[in-house]
Amino acid sequence: MAKENPPVVFGPVLSRRFGKSLGVDLSPSKKQCNYNCIYCELGKAKPIERMEEVIKVETLINAIQNALNNLTTPIDVLTITANGEPTLYPHLLELIQSIKPFLKGIKTLILSNGSLFYEPKVQQALKEFDIVKFSLDAIDLKAFERVDKPYSKDINKILEGISCFSQIYQGQLVAEVLLIKGVNDSANNLKLIAAFLKQINIARVDLSTIDRPSSFKAPKLSEDELLKCSLFFEGLCVSLPKRSITQAKKLVSCGIDELLALISRRPLSAEEAPLILDPNAFKHLETLLNHKQITIKKVGSLEFYCAF
């Protein structure tokens, strides 16, 4: 039997920081990224300069329209992401301009590693989004190479691109700094990141650590250690959110194949599962475990359902 193409739209899922989110995957078939971050939950892959497999814009638009038409609960944001880096998608501007007219008040969000913000074509597309969130895990070159394992190691060019974009962007610009114990949590690296972010037009810094199974062995920081790291960012709006289980709702009603596809993209917390899955979808977890299509992994004190 021929293998079906993976869906390009997934969710809704509960985002820790942006509410109820419907996700759009610009690279559903495989990971395509110019980084190979040690904390990536998508697995290891050789970083690339450009996308090798490009999905048609029309396919994405139709999938998004269909998903929105079939929603049973309101969402807060439409999140553009990828199995990799979404700004590698060559038709990003056409896509965002095509879908915005029928979103009816739903905010648009893109999750990027920030590495291509210096490109005019990328800047033009990003300006169309309500929220742009980029990662900045290191400025210290040694830490940058260790944590992000990039295709291009020109950190100065990346920083110049982020700074330039921040001057022309009118939406909400959010930085995420993900810290790994003993890798990029040094005082020197934190000082460099904080100093840079204080120079640009940024709405918030989301400071976090490992909370899901990752590609490489990547030790997480404790809550106390993360709190101490946040002190380097004095003067900035820093968010240190905890997973809010009480806010979760039963958002997902899906078949077993859809649930497997969802878990393949995003490991599901065992604590959240009964709260965001309806009873029928929740029962599918046991079936997937019994058939060895998913497994349970432990990260710190948390357990996650993960695809093999």
Segments the model singles out, each with a brief description of its role:
Residues 19-21, 37, 75, 131, ...:
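Structural motif
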Residues 2-17, 28, 62, 71, ...:
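Auxiliary Fe-S-binding modules of radical SAM enzymes
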Residues 88-225:
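Conserved AdoMet/S-adenosylmethionine-binding subsite of the radical SAM
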Residues 27-29, 42-43, 137, 178, ...:
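Generic beta-structure capping elements
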Residues 16-59:
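Canonical Radical SAM [4Fe-4S] cluster-binding loop centered on the CxxxCxxC motif
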Residues 79-85, 113:
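Glycine-rich beta-strand-to-loop/alpha-helix junction loops that act as flexible
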Residues 43-79, 90-94:
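Conserved alpha-helical substructure of the radical SAM core
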